[in-house]
């Protein structure tokens, strides 16, 4: 909120943003997730169960984080998921261990949060992003 508040201040935005019960804090419910999952433009994927940084965890903990959310999404949406997103997504937050665990769960693609451009030869578990502000 501090960063957001500073940006809004620079933009001379007058309304105050509260850190409690703000629209930025609202999460999607399963009804909304199911609705968006039916759209061809979107895919629903995993992002760990509790948003812990995978590379900081033991093998067993990392596996539980990855498997936990995949099982929940499979059950709620009644389908296999193939996309995932690393918490934080910077290079030091995932490794070949996490990629192997994701592949074992049937995940086919997991973008990073590293800035850059992809090619047809890019690793689908290390995809780059182009950031826009």
Where are these regions (language model features)?
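C-terminal active-site subregion of NodB/CE4 polysaccharide deacetylases
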Residues: 38, 49-52, 56-133
């Amino acid at each position: 909120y501090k960063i957001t508040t500073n940006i809004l201040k620079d933009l001379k935005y007058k309304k105050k943003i509260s850190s409690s019960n703000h629209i930025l804090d609202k999460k999607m419910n399963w009804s909304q997730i199911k609705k968006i999952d039916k759209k061809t433009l979107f895919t629903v994927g995993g992002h760990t169960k509790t948003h812990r940084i995978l590379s900081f965890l033991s093998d067993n903990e990392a596996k539980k984080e990855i498997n936990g959310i995949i099982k929940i999404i499979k059950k709620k949406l009644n389908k296999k998921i193939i996309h995932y997103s690393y918490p934080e997504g910077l290079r030091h937050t995932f490794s070949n261990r996490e990629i192997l665990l994701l592949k074992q769960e049937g995940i086919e693609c997991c973008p990073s949060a590293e800035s850059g451009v992809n090619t047809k030869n890019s690793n689908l578990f290390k995809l780059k992003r182009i950031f826009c502000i």
